[in-house]
A protein has these predicted regions:
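Conserved acidic, metal-coordinating active-site core of Asp-based
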Residues: 10, 123-242, 246, 254
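Asp-based phosphoryl-transfer active-site loop
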Residues: 28-41
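Short, structured coil segments at secondary-structure junctions
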Residues: 81, 86, 94, 198-200, ...
Length: 313
């Protein structure tokens, strides 16, 4: 009996080690907004958050960085989180593009019709707004001296290229264009006008008080995330989405578990299933530890497998 007991104990230990990564996972995809969510106010990933995200990836959860930033600006964060090693994804430009972090394959993409660029430039000039777009590791703009554009370039490690004739210089279909002004009322007025004028052609929204974003029609984080779920064969119930801003509301509502950061506006919190701590208080780590790490249960080991292993122990 003693030898049999030792044999069974040895078998259980062996099989638990063998199956340590085969855990029952309720959630398979973790979608994270970046600025104000993944990053603290110093634009850094905290040690606790980094450790938690590496842990859940080791457990089999795949991570999506979902941001308004350009793809190039998200790559250093993807590398830090080792998304390429764990089958993660980058959802950039607020949903205009999704790439596989492992091999750079574009899984989803929508771009602005270049024929719309002269119209956008005309409206920007008429209102005295700066205008820019992204291209690979550069920003193309008619206003390189603009403080907000310079900050955007620094944040994403991009070079600024000045082009006086913006629409003539942009000889490609951009994922999105940005109009920039400190006149918030004027930006709001153009946003309202364009929502009526461009309905069905382009979508516009303000991501910051000084930024008016122009993207292809029907593009947001949720719609693009839905396309990714189709590619992966996953259900929305298997998704956790975490965000802090108005641009994150649709993906928070789409996810099986939608989480708002503690510093979010009340309107964002109202759409969430759960409110975590702020980005200055490791809110992502708190959410992940509660929703994933503490909820995981070891996979069941079939009795016949246990008995078979016991016979050979």
């Amino acid at each position: 009996f003693y030898l049999f007991t030792l044999s069974v104990v040895h078998s259980i230990s062996y099989l638990c080690n063998l199956n340590q990564n085969r855990v029952i996972m309720k959630y398979k995809l973790l979608v994270l907004d970046v600025d104000g969510t993944l990053l603290n106010d110093a634009k850094e990933i905290s040690k606790r958050t980094l450790a938690a995200l590496l842990k859940v990836q080791q457990m089999g959860v795949r991570i999506v960085l979902a941001s308004g930033r350009p793809t190039y600006g998200l790559m250093p964060l993807a590398k830090m989180l080792e998304l390429g090693n764990y089958g993660g994804f980058i959802l950039s430009y607020n949903g205009c593009q999704i790439i596989n972090a492992q091999n750079g394959e574009i899984l989803f993409e929508r771009r602005i019709n270049p024929e719309m660029l002269p119209y956008l430039e005309k409206k920007a000039r008429k209102n005295g707004f700066a205008l820019f777009t992204y291209h690979d590791d550069t920003i193309i703009t008619d206003s390189p001296e603009n403080e907000h554009i310079q900050n955007e370039a620094r944040l994403n490690n991009l070079q600024i290229i000045k082009e006086e004739e913006f629409s003539a210089a942009v000889d490609f279909a951009p994922c999105k264009c940005m109009l920039v002004s400190d006149d918030e009322e004027a930006l709001l007025g153009l946003e309202d006008h364009w929502k009526r004028r461009l309905n069905g052609a382009l979508d516009v929204f303000r991501s910051e008080p000084y930024f008016l974003e122009v993207v292809p029609c029907a593009i947001d984080k949720a719609n693009s995330l839905g396309a990714l779920l189709e590619v992966l064969g996953m259900k929305r119930e298997e998704v956790i989405a975490v965000g802090d801003g108005v641009c994150d509301v649709t993906m928070i509502q789409l996810a099986g578990l939608g989480i708002a950061m503690g510093h979010s506006q009340d309107s964002v919190k109202a759409c969430a299933d759960y409110v975590t701590a702020s980005n200055e208080e490791d809110g992502v780590a708190v959410a992940v530890e509660k929703a994933i790490i503490s909820e995981v249960r070891a996979a069941e080991i079939p009795l016949d497998q246990l008995n078979a292993q016991a016979r050979h122990a």
